[in-house]
């Protein structure tokens, strides 16, 4: 049994961590922090956790957090980096759900996130926590940068095509739509029920900060000597609470030498406990992954032409955030990778 701490426990990813860790056979959550709610019992703020979590929120204290075996940061971007240098010296292992350590190019991160990085020397020590790619490095990592929600769905959808150099890396397109919880638990007019209900819109078309993260991940798996992957990424807002549906497009390099794409995807993910390649012709639905740590994928080649279409769905709060964070923790501590995550999706 290990002790876990959560920094930033009042957001949606924080409460999702609590929901999943409450039933984890190897983990005891010993501290959860919130400056705004310090002293308030967790179950009073989140009644779904009554009878499962008997903790009160506390002020962040590095000395207390340093007594944990692992600490999850479920904080806004820019917060974790300020505590990280001191906390890492305690020997505590860290899973950061924010974007602070995802992008290795610090000036690029600063450009997209609009702030100076508070711990640039630690960026190179972070392991990007996409288990389907970096499982071996995650095992020994002291600091894991948990991928974003859009990057998770997009990279898992594209990986088999990019790894095998089957498509033009300069002509990748991702149209991805997320539920409103992807914007976080904060008051925003654009996210009010009356604003998003019965509507559907794109946003961030000029540039979304998940773009450099996705491109970095795709470039990491490209064969040597191949032109760097370039992605056109257009996010959309869905009038649902949770879920991401990514529709991905890629252009084949040689239409005369194309392997069976269904078999390619099935073989690539055959041993991945949280990636489900659907039978040929089936379409994934966001509701099929709600509350679960699963990514469901379908692959198509319409009219047998030069375009490959991949459909990828995840729950943005689970496989896109807290579930994947726990998956990383399981790998780091040698637990069964599915421990605490063997959850059936909610229907209806």
From Swiss-Prot:
Disulfide bonds: none annotated. SUPFAM superfamilies: Glyceraldehyde-3-phosphate dehydrogenase-like, C-terminal domain, NAD(P)-binding Rossmann-fold domains. Its main location: cytoplasm. The active site is at residue 149. It holds the Pfam family Semialdhyde_dh. Its EC number is 1.2.1.38. GO terms for molecular function: N-acetyl-gamma-glutamyl-phosphate reductase activity; NAD binding; NADP+ binding. It catalyses: N-acetyl-L-glutamate 5-semialdehyde + phosphate + NADP(+) = N-acetyl-L-glutamyl 5-phosphate + NADPH + H(+). One of its GO terms (biological process) is L-arginine biosynthetic process. GO terms for cellular component: cytoplasm. PROSITE patterns: ARGC. Keywords: Amino-acid biosynthesis, Arginine biosynthesis, Cytoplasm, NADP, Oxidoreductase. Pathway: Amino-acid biosynthesis; L-arginine biosynthesis; N(2)-acetyl-L-ornithine from L-glutamate: step 3/4. It is an enzyme of class 1 (oxidoreductase). HAMAP family: ArgC_type1. Belongs to the NAGSA dehydrogenase family. Type 1 subfamily. Catalyzes the NADPH-dependent reduction of N-acetyl-5-glutamyl phosphate to yield N-acetyl-L-glutamate 5-semialdehyde. This is N-acetyl-gamma-glutamyl-phosphate reductase. It comes from Cellvibrio japonicus (strain Ueda107) (Pseudomonas fluorescens subsp. cellulosa). The lineage of its organism: Bacteria, Pseudomonadati, Pseudomonadota, Gammaproteobacteria, Cellvibrionales. The gene is argC.
């Amino acid at each position: 049994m290990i002790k876990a701490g959560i920094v930033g426990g009042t957001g949606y990813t924080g409460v999702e961590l609590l929901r999943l860790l409450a039933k984890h056979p190897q983990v005891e959550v010993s501290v959860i922090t919130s400056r705004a709610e310090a002293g308030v019992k967790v179950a009073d703020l989140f009644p779904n956790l009554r009878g499962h979590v008997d903790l009160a929120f506390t002020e962040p204290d590095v000395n207390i957090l340093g007594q944990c075996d692992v600490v999850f940061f479920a904080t806004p971007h820019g917060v974790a980096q300020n505590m990280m240098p001191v906390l890492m010296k305690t020997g505590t292992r860290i899973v950061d759900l924010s974007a602070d350590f995802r992008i290795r190019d610090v000036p690029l991160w600063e450009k997209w996130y609009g702030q100076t990085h508070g711990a640039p020397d630690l960026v190179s020590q972070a392991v990007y926590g996409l288990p389907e790619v970096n499982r071996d490095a995650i095992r020994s990592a002291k600091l894991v940068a948990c991928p974003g929600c859009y990057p998770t769905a997009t990279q898992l959808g594209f990986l088999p095509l990019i790894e095998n150099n089957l498509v033009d890396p300069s002509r990748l397109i991702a149209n991805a739509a997320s539920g409103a919880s992807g914007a976080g638990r904060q008051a925003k007019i654009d996210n009010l029920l009356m604003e998003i209900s019965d509507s559907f819109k794109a946003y961030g078309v000029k540039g979304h900060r998940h773009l450099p993260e996705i491109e970095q991940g795709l470039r990491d798996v490209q064969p040597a000597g191949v032109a760097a992957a370039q992605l056109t990424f257009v996010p959309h807002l869905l009038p649902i609470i949770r879920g991401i549906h990514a529709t991905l497009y890629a252009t084949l390099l040689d239409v005369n030498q194309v392997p069976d794409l269904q078999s390619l995807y099935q073989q690539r993910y055959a041993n991945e406990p949280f990636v489900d390649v659907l039978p040929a012709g089936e379409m994934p639905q966001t509701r099929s992954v709600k509350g679960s740590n699963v990514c469901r994928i379908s692959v198509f080649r319409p009219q047998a032409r030069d375009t490959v279409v991949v459909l990828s769905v995840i729950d943005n709060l689970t496989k896109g955030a807290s579930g994947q964070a726990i998956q990383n923790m399981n790998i780091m501590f040698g637990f069964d990778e599915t421990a605490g995550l063997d959850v059936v999706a909610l229907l209806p």
